[in-house]
């Protein structure tokens, strides 16, 4: 099942032939991208620095790779270390995208964007959406933030950054290796090697899988689910409560199968409902003809809170990275802390 949202062309990842028109357009996109990047690198276009450290969490492919779970984990780590983080985002797909906005936990996703609302809901830190990330960063600094985390924005070169973190999906990687629109690449694969940290999103993985999936200089990120929170309020249930039961599983994310597999790994019988990424949900979208429990990702849940009921549950996702990753990152960041 799918609806209004964004769909990934199948030929990006499944090995099927790329339409000839897309092949012709890809070099044009690559050329414009390379020229734009060169303009910033050589100083032909101005870059703007903020008076506080800037960390960009992004990817070189179009679509989701696990940036938001990492951003949330990063914000929580920074706050625990005594920093006052703020998050800057474009707010993909939101209404009135030309108008900057402070995003709160209860901001409608149509106004604030899916990921910014989720980040505000999960962390409570200041979140600013603005097509101009320089302006967003300045607003966050004025609000008292002493470190800025950009959720996405690796290609937004106008904003100078101190640390770049690239996130790539372990299963999809860089797809067919072609530039948009023939493939998923926003920039050549070589761009990933220039980032300060490279994180591989493994989903559920053990240490052996992590070792096999990560090359030199790459850090494994595992995703964990443990509980389900009723959208109508009330106490969370452990996922073990649903073991042996059938549930409707809802995922409107870039890689919905991963969520379904995570639930199945917990012994839950899954009736899958894959929606488009950035799906604009309506109540009828969750009407499946039965009152089996409905388990959904938190990204979907923030768009369904207004009409959620007692059998609709959000499943929180927790990102886990090696302790050495956090040590390396905080060491780099501490060197940027003003004396």
Swiss-Prot record:
EC number in record: 2.7.1.130
**InterPro entries registered for this protein in UniProt:** LpxK, P-loop_NTPase
SUPFAM superfamilies per the UniProt record, alphabetical: P-loop containing nucleoside triphosphate hydrolases (SSF52540)
Catalysed reactions, as listed in the record: a lipid A disaccharide + ATP = a lipid IVA + ADP + H(+)
List, in alphabetical order, the GO biological process terms annotated in this UniProt record.
lipid A biosynthetic process; lipopolysaccharide core region biosynthetic process
Superkingdom in the source lineage:
Bacteria
Q: Which GO terms describe its cellular component?
A: plasma membrane
Pathway given for this chain reads:
Glycolipid biosynthesis; lipid IV(A) biosynthesis; lipid IV(A) from (3R)-3-hydroxytetradecanoyl-[acyl-carrier-protein] and UDP-N-acetyl-alpha-D-glucosamine: step 6/6
The alphabetical list of record keywords is: ATP-binding, Kinase, Lipid A biosynthesis, Lipid biosynthesis, Lipid metabolism, Nucleotide-binding, Transferase
State the top-level EC class: transferase
A molecular function (GO) term? ATP binding
Q: Where does ATP bind?
A: 61-68
The UniProt entry's sequence similarity note says:
Belongs to the LpxK family.
Annotated function: Transfers the gamma-phosphate of ATP to the 4'-position of a tetraacyldisaccharide 1-phosphate intermediate (termed DS-1-P) to form tetraacyldisaccharide 1,4'-bis-phosphate (lipid IVA).
Protein name from the UniProt record: Tetraacyldisaccharide 4'-kinase
Q: Provide the species name.
A: Stenotrophomonas maltophilia (strain K279a)
């Amino acid at each position: 099942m799918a609806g209004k949202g964004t769909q990934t062309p199948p030929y990006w990842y499944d090995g099927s032939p790329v339409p000839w028109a897309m092949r012709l357009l890809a070099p044009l996109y690559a050329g414009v991208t390379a020229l734009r990047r060169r303009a910033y690198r050589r100083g032909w276009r101005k870059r703007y620095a903020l008076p506080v450290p800037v960390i960009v969490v992004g990817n070189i492919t179009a679509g989701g790779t696990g940036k938001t779970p990492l951003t949330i984990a990063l914000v929580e780590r920074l706050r625990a270390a005594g920093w006052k983080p703020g998050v800057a985002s474009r707010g993909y797909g939101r209404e009135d995208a030309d108008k900057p906005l402070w995003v709160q936990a209860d901001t409608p996703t149509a106004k604030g964007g899916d990921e910014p609302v989720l980040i505000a809901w999960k962390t409570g830190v200041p979140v600013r959406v603005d097509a101009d990330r320089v302006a967003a960063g300045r607003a966050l600094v004025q609000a008292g933030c002493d470190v800025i985390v950009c959720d996405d924005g690796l290609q937004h070169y106008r904003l100078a950054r101190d640390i770049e973190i690239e996130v790539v999906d372990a299963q999809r990687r860089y797809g067919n290796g072609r530039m948009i629109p023939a493939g998923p690449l926003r920039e050549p694969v070589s761009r990933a090697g220039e980032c300060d940290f490279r994180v591989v999103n493994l989903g559920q993985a053990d240490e052996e899988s992590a070792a096999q999936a990560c090359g030199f200089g790459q850090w494994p990120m595992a995703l964990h689910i443990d509980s389900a929170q009723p959208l109508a309020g009330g106490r969370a249930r452990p996922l073990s409560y649903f073991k042996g039961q059938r549930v409707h599983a809802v995922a409107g994310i870039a890689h919905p199968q991963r969520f379904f597999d995570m639930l199945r790994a917990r012994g839950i019988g899954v009736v899958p409902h894959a929606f488009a990424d950035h799906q604009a949900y309506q109540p009828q979208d969750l009407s499946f003809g039965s009152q089996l429990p409905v388990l959904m990702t938190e990204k979907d849940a923030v768009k369904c809170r207004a009409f959620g009921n007692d059998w609709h549950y959000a499943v929180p996702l927790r990102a886990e990275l090696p302790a050495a990753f956090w040590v390396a990152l905080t060491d780099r960041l501490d060197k940027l802390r003003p004396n």
